[in-house]
Amino acid sequence: MEMQQNCSISCFWETQPLGCVKISCIFYHSKPRNINGLFLPPSSNITLQKEIQEGIPLQSQSQEPLKPQENISRPIHHPLVLKTNFEEEEEVDEQNDASSLWTKTPEEIEEKRAIKEMCYKSGEYYRFHTPPDILSSKSMTPTAEKQLEKPLENGSELQEGDSLTVPTKLSQYERQGEIKTSLHGKPKTDIAAFENGGGDCYVPQRVIFLGVDESEALTEEKEITISKCSNTKDNKDSPHPKHSLTTRLVPTTHVLNATENISMKCREDPSSMNDVQPVKKPHFKGVKKRKWIYDEPQNFPNSGMQRAVQAPRPQNKMSYHRNNKNRNAENASYIHVQRDAVRTVALNAPSRSRPTHGSYNKVHANREPKPNLSPDKYTSTSYNDSAWRKRIPFSKTYSKSEKIYPEPRRNGSK
């Protein structure tokens, strides 16, 4: 059957430029073919007769591919599952109607009616009565908020120039909590917190609810600071421990919080102001300058004492360079370290008895003939002995208590 059907179909490769190259090609060929020297005539007359009759089978073939498409589209257009579901639902409804006919008695009807009434009443209680409650609560909250916002909107309690920002609008719960805390407990001012540079940051909000006028508190603070600054200038040299609290720099934010605490405590208990002394920044500068003058060693009567105080600095430099020199020396490390240890012990002894250190500086100048070291301002007088060093470059002076060890000279080490 396939042979006869394929003979009625023209070959596709004839339309191509090379033509059909297959010798045993089953399809119909209207042109002769030459395949590798083999001549093949066109198809026979039997195929032509079949070709005339191609109209009927072609129509049947054109209808054949449409049939499977219709079969595929049928379940989409006619779903059987929905029909079965509808039928089942109808059957269930019929069964319910039949059961209702059997069970409908006056007692059961009353029970169903009572159940429906109970459900309706419960729905009214839980659903229909809640919106009025919500509306009433909403109508009450704005009035309460307006009453609480009135003292804040006046602006008399707000302080200008302060880095603290007071919120103008708060929720009802926060306002009630703050009012309770301000009424039940007094605001606490800790003196130790002021000494450590801190303060109670929540005090300004409590000041507002207590009704304290902060403009008056600021004027009182200015008067207190002026009086206390005059007292501290008079009592600079007094060794009282309370004045030492005012000689320490405090950050500006902590000073603001602490001054607010002081103003609050001054309103409550004026006697407590004797413990804390607020000081402005210019007074801190004077205290800092006085401390610097005290630390500088400029008031010594003798220049020898000044040299004795600053003498350990060149000694540390010379010992550092000497240790580096001894590390680089070969085959003589142990002897050099032992010699340096004995020498440092001998040189530290006269430094306690004699503050001028005349021989001490000479010993260092002889021991280190390096010209690249920059001399300090305290040892410049003893370090300018260049002529004496040129005469005896390797001479060394030893004290009485110092031991003299023979120095081995190896590989050009001095």
Curated annotation (Swiss-Prot):
Annotated Polar residues bias: 350-359
Coiled-coil regions, chain positions: none
Pfam families: DUF5571, zf-CCCH_3
Basic and acidic residues: compositionally biased ranges: 399-414
InterPro entries: DUF5571 (IPR040943), Znf-CCCH_3 (IPR041686)
Stretches for region Disordered: 136-168, 297-333, 346-414
Residues of the signal peptide: none
GO biological process terms held by the UniProt record: poly(A)+ mRNA export from nucleus
Protein name: Uncharacterized protein C12orf50
Source organism of this protein record: Homo sapiens
